[in-house]
Structures are given as structure tokens and as C-alpha cells.
């Protein structure tokens, strides 16, 4: 019997060197062909995705057109806008590939609000860079309005926002209902729209999409969390002569490698932490970190990728 899987798409599944809408749609057609391999094997999919380049470009457009009569939209609204655009492209691409395969299934995109704690320490120390690069003078002028800017690796100054951890997903029950009715679901785009309180007030923040995907996998009681990235395996001693691929690894082993500093913050580390958190959430859970091209191996005797178990 197939598994209920949350599949978190990496940036390379959407964006190539061409940032046009057409190119991103074409990339998602190729991505959808890989996802359909899983659907053919009987798996039930909840697909999440990033939005970093897309929301960055949208913020540039908002800034360029900002005026009294046409004010720029806030970050939470921009995240919602990219959830809509990428969700539209992805659902369209999935429908194309399902039709080619002769599979009759519905696809639904869910605008997803992810609840964060207003007392999260991340709000005291914004670290996530967003938007365009500015000169120091431009950044200092912008900071007078209350924004926080930091110098970014010699490339200029960028606005930084908090990256709080998700504590709940408002639409989780809706997503689970769709899955129970065998509807392929796209949700938690860009880590979700960050909201706080019972009134679900949007806040200026960015939620890591791997942590949001993990929280979603917990809430819908998924069997597996599949995190896609640009490499086939998680490695220790990455880029060194003694580099080693991890195939089957336990949470305890991953924790040791993490403490030894094998995983880079902002790159592989959040994927590792999300995988550990999901596998520890309940018995018999599995996390897989691999590349898009290896999705077809998920039901084989040997999964190509790093399989994390308790």
C-alpha cells in the first residue's frame, strides 16, 4: 500500500537561469513528471515548495513601483502572492502529467497560513536576508523607518527579517480532508504565510520551508517526509577527500554529525533538523533527503538518498 508523503521541493525544482514565468512553468512540468512516478506507485502526496527567488523578485517589483498611490505590499502578502502563482503553475503542470499518464486525480492548491509564536527569539534577532542589495547610505536611510539591514558578504546591504519556527498550520485539517479524499495537495508554499494570534495577523517574517513541511507532515500524520535538494545524499566531510555519503542513518547518528559541525547553517542544517524532528515525532516515521531525479526510487528495494529512521 502506498504511503502518505509530504514532498518538499527545493529551489532547483522551480527556477533555472531563466526567471521568466514561462521558464518556471516548464521547470515545474519536468518536476511534475517525477512526482507522477510516486503517484503511479500509489503514494498520496502533499507537495510543499520554496519561494525565495520568486518572493525576492516580487519585492524588487514592489519597491520599484512604490508610491503614495500605489504602495508596496507587505512581506506576508507577497508570500501569499507567490503561493498563488507557484501553486497555479504547479497544479497546472501536475494536471498535464497526470493526463499524459492516464491518471484521473484532482489537484488542489491551498493558501496556507502558518502560526508562529510572537515571543519566538527569532523576532529579537532577525537574520533572514530578503529583497534587493542596497548601498550603505541607502540602507541607513531605510533604517530610519524601523527596518533592520545588515551587510551581506561584501555584496551590499540587505533587509533582514525574523525566521521563527512554525507551531501550527491553520489549514492542516482542510489539507488532511483533501488527502483523505485522494486529492493531491499543494500547500505551505514558501514556508507558509506567517501569522500570529487567534486573529491570524500577518507578520513580517520568513518561515523555513523545511520546518514548515515537517510541521505539516506531523499534523497530517504523514508516513514519510521527503526533502528534495540539489544532491543525491547527505554527506559528512562534504567537499573533502574523505567525503562520505550517508545512506541509512539513525537520528542518534545524525545528532552526532550535527554536533560535530558537518552541516552548514542555512543550507543542509535545517533539512537535517527537520528530518530529525519528524522521525522523533511518532513511531515508525521516515525522512528521506535526496534529489528530485531520485523520486522514482522511493518504492524500490533501495532508495537512492539518505534515509533517516529512529
UniProtKB/Swiss-Prot annotation:
Q: What is the effect of changing residue 138 to A?
A: No change in activity
Catalytic reaction equation(s)? hydrogencarbonate + NH4(+) + ATP = carbamoyl phosphate + ADP + H2O + H(+)
Q: Which GO terms describe its biological process?
A: arginine deiminase pathway
Which pathway, per its entry?
Answer: Metabolic intermediate metabolism; carbamoyl phosphate degradation; CO(2) and NH(3) from carbamoyl phosphate: step 1/1
What does the record give as EC number? 2.7.2.2
User: Regulation of activity: what does the record state?
Assistant: Inhibited by adenosine(5')pentaphospho(5')adenosine (Ap5A), Ap6A and to a much lower extent by Ap4A.
In the record, what terms sit under GO molecular function?
ATP binding; carbamate kinase activity
> Which GO terms of the cellular component aspect does the record hold?
cytosol
InterPro entries the record matches: AceGlu_kinase-like_sf (IPR036393), Asp/Glu/Uridylate_kinase (IPR001048), Carb_kinase (IPR003964)
Which top-level enzyme class is recorded in the Swiss-Prot or TrEMBL entry? transferase
- Localization per record: Cytoplasm
**The keyword Nucleotide-binding belongs to this UniProt entry's keyword annotation:** yes
What upregulates this protein? By arginine.
Recite the UniProt keywords alphabetically: Arginine metabolism, ATP-binding, Cytoplasm, Kinase, Nucleotide-binding, Transferase
Q: What is the effect of changing residue 140 to A?
A: No change in activity
Assembly, in brief, is: Homodimer (predominantly) and homotetramer.
Role: Catalyzes the reversible synthesis of carbamate and ATP from carbamoyl phosphate and ADP. Can also catalyze, although with low efficiency, the phosphorylation of bicarbonate, leading to the formation of carboxyphosphate, an unstable intermediate found in the reactions catalyzed by carbamoyl-phosphate synthase and biotin carboxylase. Can also use acetate.
- Which family does the record assign? Belongs to the carbamate kinase family.
Name of this protein? Carbamate kinase 1
Identify the species of origin: Enterococcus faecium (Streptococcus faecium)
Recite the lineage of the species: Bacteria, Bacillati, Bacillota, Bacilli, Lactobacillales
Amino acid at each position: 500500500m502506498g504511503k502518505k508523503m509530504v514532498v518538499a521541493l527545493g529551489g532547483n525544482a522551480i527556477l533555472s537561469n531563466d526567471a521568466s514565468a514561462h521558464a518556471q512553468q516548464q521547470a515545474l512540468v519536468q518536476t511534475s513528471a517525477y512526482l507522477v512516478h510516486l503517484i503511479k506507485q500509489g503514494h498520496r502526496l502533499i507537495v510543499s515548495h520554496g519561494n525565495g527567488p520568486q518572493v525576492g523578485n516580487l519585492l524588487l517589483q514592489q519597491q520599484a513601483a512604490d508610491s503614495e498611490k500605489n504602495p508596496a505590499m507587505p512581506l506576508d502578502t507577497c508570500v501569499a502572492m507567490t503561493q498563488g502563482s507557484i501553486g497555479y503553475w504547479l497544479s497546472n503542470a501536475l494536471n498535464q502529467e497526470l493526463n499524459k499518464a492516464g491518471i484521473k486525480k484532482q489537484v488542489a492548491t491551498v493558501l496556507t497560513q502558518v502560526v508562529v509564536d510572537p515571543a519566538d527569539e527569532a523576532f529579537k534577532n532577525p537574520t533572514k536576508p530578503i529583497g534587493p542589495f542596497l548601498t550603505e547610505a541607502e540602507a541607513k536611510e531605510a533604517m530610519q523607518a524601523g527596518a533592520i539591514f545588515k551587510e551581506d558578504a561584501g555584496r551590499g546591504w540587505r533587509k533582514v527579517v525574523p525566521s521563527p519556527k512554525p507551531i501550527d498550520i491553520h489549514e492542516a485539517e482542510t489539507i488532511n480532508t483533501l488527502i483523505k479524499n485522494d486529492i493531491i495537495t499543494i500547500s505551505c508554499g514558501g514556508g507558509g504565510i506567517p501569522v500570529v494570534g487567534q486573529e491570524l495577523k500577518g507578520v513580517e517574517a520568513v518561515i523555513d520551508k523545511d520546518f514548515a513541511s515537517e510541521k505539516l507532515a506531523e499534523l497530517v500524520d504523514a508516513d514519510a517526509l521527503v526533502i528534495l535538494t540539489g544532491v543525491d545524499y547527505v554527506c559528512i566531510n562534504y567537499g573533502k577527500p574523505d567525503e562520505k555519503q550517508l545512506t541509512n542513518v539513525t537520528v542518534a547518528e545524525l545528532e552526532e554529525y550535527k554536533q560535530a559541525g558537518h552541516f552548514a547553517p542555512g543550507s543542509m542544517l535545517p533539512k537535517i533538523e527537520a528530518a530529525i524532528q519528524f522521525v522523533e515525532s511518532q513511531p515508525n516515521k521516515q525522512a528521506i533527503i535526496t534529489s528530485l531525479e531520485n523520486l522514482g526510487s522511493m518504492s524500490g528495494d533501495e532508495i537512492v538518498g539518505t534515509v533517516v529512521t529512529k
